[in-house]
Amino acid sequence: MADSQENKQKEQNDVSEKNFMIEKIKERPVNKKKLLRRTLITASMAVIFGLVACFTFLVLEPVISNWLYPEEEPQVVVFPEDQDEMSPEQMLAENMQQENQNSQSSSVPGEVMEQEQIRELLSGIILDLDNYKQIYSALAQYVAEMNRSMVTVTGVSSGVDWFNNVNESKNQSSGVIIAQNGKQLLILTDYSPVKQVDDIIVTFNDGTQADASLKEKDETTGLAVIAVELDTLNEDFLKNDITIATLGSSNIKDIAGLPVVALGRPMGTNGSLGYGIITSSASESAASDTTYRILQTNIVGSQNAGGVLFNLQGQVIGIITNGKSATDMKNMVCAYGITELKRHIEKMSNGEKFAYLGLKGVDVTAEANSELRVPYGAYITEVEMDSPAMLAGIQQGDVITGFGERVIVSFDEYTNSLLSMKPGDSVELTIMRQSQQEYKEMKFDITLTVLK
């Protein structure tokens, strides 16, 4: 009994101890200020994270896209080099000569038709009015086809006058479509209308208009290449409504007498044209580091003429220029020969700048070599002020015989060697300089710059 009572007493003591240990835990009251602060901090961190993510995406997205889907580079534009060509008249004369030789080998001498007899037969051919109509009708069809390669280029500039009125000025020139590089349609035009303008607008022969940008310019000739993005033009339009002109050759023996058509603005207005022949190709125009052949025609035009000369095979053989005619022939249309321009047009079409040395010169003739002992090379007639050549010590009368590793025997070879260089390149020039009665070799290291 006593044990059971002790046990009960212990149980009661344990229960009282447990009751004593039970506590009521109250919830901590919400601190609204702390909660608001944490909410603001969390929201701010989320905004900052979003901004960082957006910035990172904007920066890396083009890099990743170009890495995954690399953009195709424009194709390099290359024009085929000229080969010795014969004019149609030369081909006809050669064929007649061949026929005469064949007839001489198969006929007795008395049956051979002499040239005088041929001229007499030709002089008996009389053209009537219908023949002239047919000739000019054929020329009109030819011009319509060639005009598919011609465009009008408009340079637009905006300005504000004294009264805060916006003025818009426009300058126009003609242009010819010369190539496309897979991304752009390339057009050769005058530089002055597109120099430092706000917008360039190209109007094609059918009236379609498109925006263009300056690809590159050539200060020495006053020419430029502008580009129209292909994705801004309709595919059917590209296939059916325009034609890329073919650059021919002006390096034709006896080119005088070759029939030509002047398109663009030979009369000083866009869309004008002229028919005629080349009367001379003997004159040249010297410019910085190059020389151009001038094609003179019998087409009476404007002193502000522009455009191109086509031969009757549909090829561009000259780029019309002004101010290059003789003083007594100022209104006769003349043009730069396309052969001398091809490398310049090629560099502009690829967006490459021209390296500048600052020399004008001529070839050393056989007479000068034999009589005066002048070595063959590029004879320097002028060194331009403050040019890299002048600063290096090149003088008038020097003869360039080496350009780097290349041997130079003419001024054309010097020009072509320079065209293969870029501004900033260095080159070693080998020259021969007269010292008393003999020429001595000298070498100059020159860094090329850009013509300004």
Listing of model-derived features with the role each one plays in the protein:
Residues 1-150, 154-157, 162, 236, ...:
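N-terminal targeting leaders that route proteins to membranes or the secretory/organellar pathways
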Residues 168-169, 197-198, 233-242, 263-276, ...:
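Active-site loop architecture of trypsin-fold serine endopeptidases
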Residues 162-170, 217-221, 232-239, 281-295, ...:
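Gly/Ser-enriched beta-turn/beta-hairpin loop segments
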Residues 63, 67-70, 182-224, 228-231:
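Catalytic-histidine neighborhood of serine endopeptidases
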Residues 246-270:
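Short glycine/Trp-rich loop-beta-loop segment that forms part of the substrate-binding cleft
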Residues 131-141, 156-184, 209-211, 244-246, ...:
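A conserved glycine-rich beta-strand in the N-terminal activation segment of trypsin-fold
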Residues 167, 347-417, 425, 430-452:
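PDZ/PDZ-like groove recognition
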